[in-house]
């Protein structure tokens, strides 16, 4: 076991006693003690204030890499400990000071069964969040709180309860001074979230084989070309001319250029960013007004300007149907993709059509990618869609070479994995 994976390193001197006891029991796979110590989910989620070690991290890390000394009993005790912690609400994607989740540790140590337990916990959590999405949380007795506050103010005005208010302030100050240190995740996880609205208000630049916004976020990059080519091959298996195609998100125009080569009967593009639309209007993009006028019929080749949420409704109302649909937007979370294939695809995709999307869900971390693959598959099935995942190798060594990868000037790499899972979706049955 590496020195930085030892218990003496992972449990710091500043670790509160109750968390230290829990980490030690989890490390030893002492399930009975773990059960005795856990009385609330918070106990299962406690982290060392310096290392970020959680009981889940500890239970997995202590296994080390597989060796001849491993016994079936040791393995079962480790699985039982991890399962118990997850049952009590241990968080599958909490990171430590090495920016590793418990699943990341399991993958690094080549512990596939423990890794799978973390993946399944992630799937359960994300499916639960999906069920809760759209429901407004109940207020926590706001009116009662206001009434109590008003009562306290009235008593203070009478002068009878003022000393208690002073005492309360002193107690609060003392409590703040005694508040134990809380682990702060690595800065890489504290970056500002990019939203669709922020992106649409941003300035973008096309340069050196990439499209980047003014915050340095990579919107699209040339390394995706092979993925786009394979996506076109999957959406249009025989490259037959005369197909009806819809693409959401123009980006650099990589996939639209490939679609255009097949000489479709209908080729519609939805794009919302003003500066991307300005670029499209130039001859350099190859999708300006000249391209629109080259269609086999008026409106057959068209760039729809606006958000897909509104344009999609218009297409549905006008009865448009497509043989191939591709979805690749920027700054939107998984919920928007799910809404598209749940509410829009049933009406826009031909019964024999094929739907695909850029699968970058959680692609900066393997366990997140694995979790979202399973979650998306379940939600696609709920929407009446079957999905086949085509695995495409990504040469990360080549991408890592500074003179080849084109990542210079990009704030964060949104892709770090060796394999891309390309989704090919068709209607069930």
UniProtKB/Swiss-Prot annotation:
InterPro entries associated with the record? Ankyrin_rpt-contain_sf, Arginine_N-MeTrfase_2, RMT2/GAMT_Mtase, RMT2_dom, SAM-dependent_MTases_sf
A GO cellular component annotation here is: nucleus
Q: What are the BP-aspect GO terms?
A: methylation
Per UniProt, the ranges with Low complexity bias are 164-174
Q: Which residues form the RMT2 domain?
A: 190-429
User: Could you tell me the keywords of this UniProt record?
Assistant: Cytoplasm, Methyltransferase, Nucleus, S-adenosyl-L-methionine, Transferase
Is S-adenosyl-L-methionine among the key words of this record? yes
UniProt xrefs under Gene3D superfamilies: Ankyrin repeat-containing domain, Vaccinia Virus protein VP39
Main subcellular localisation: cytoplasm
Show the GO MF annotations: protein arginine N5-methyltransferase activity
Region of interest: Disordered: 41-76, 137-180
Top-level EC class? transferase
Q: Which residues cross the membrane?
A: none
Q: Where does S-adenosyl-L-methionine bind?
A: 199, 228, 250-255, 271-273, 308-309, 328
Q: Per the record's keyword annotation, is Nucleotide-binding included, yes or no? A: no
Compositional bias (Acidic residues) at which positions? Answer: 137-163
Where is this protein localized, as stated in its record? Cytoplasm; Nucleus
E.C. number: 2.1.1.-
Q: How does it assemble?
A: Monomer.
According to its UniProt entry, the function of this protein is described as: S-adenosyl-L-methionine-dependent protein-arginine N-methyltransferase that methylates the delta-nitrogen atom of arginine residues to form N5-methylarginine (type IV) in target proteins. Monomethylates ribosomal protein L12.
Indicate the family of this protein: Belongs to the class I-like SAM-binding methyltransferase superfamily. RMT2 methyltransferase family.
- What is the protein name stated in its UniProt record? Protein arginine N-methyltransferase 2
Organism phylogeny: Eukaryota, Fungi, Dikarya, Ascomycota, Pezizomycotina
